[in-house]
Amino acid sequence: MPRVVLDDSVAPDFRTLIQATWVQFLNVFDARASCFGDIRIVAVKELADRAQYDPTTVTMLVRVPERGSLLRAALVHEWAHHVEFQCAAHSEMRLAFLDAQGMPRNTPWQSMQGSTHLPFYEWGKIPSEQYAETVVAVVLGDRSFWTPVRITDEGLRVVTAWAKKEPLP
């Protein structure tokens, strides 16, 4: 079972929040847990975004302090990217997700330059970011703050089915 590996920079109250949120995440992605590994989490005081995932080091930076609801959403969002980068089977879901979101099938899944530098309104158009925000809604039941990302009921069904290794809608 994959684990979160917590850096010494992570305070005790944040550790508790991370562990509880990880349990929620694994409850949804349990059927896929064998295709992604551990992830390291480092707490930082300054970061342009709330959180950032680096697939080359399998490390997530999280800006603290922050409200618990925002931290939970940021954790789940970046863990969704972790699954996306580590789980080869993730590609099985992409066309169904693009269809569910009403996007052309030839839409690039990710921005070639990454997405952290993009304006918020452009960031929300990237399928990979729509997927990650949809995962937030699936795992946490909703999104605790507004983003420009459009989530569809069909997208929620696709992500949920894929996470549980059920037939895609």
Region locations from a protein language model:
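Post-signal peptide N-terminal regions of Sec-secreted extracellular proteins
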Residues: P2, P55-T56, E66-S69, G155-V158, ...
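Soluble non-cytosolic domains of exported or imported proteins
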Residues: A11-A20, P65-A74, E122-I126, Q130
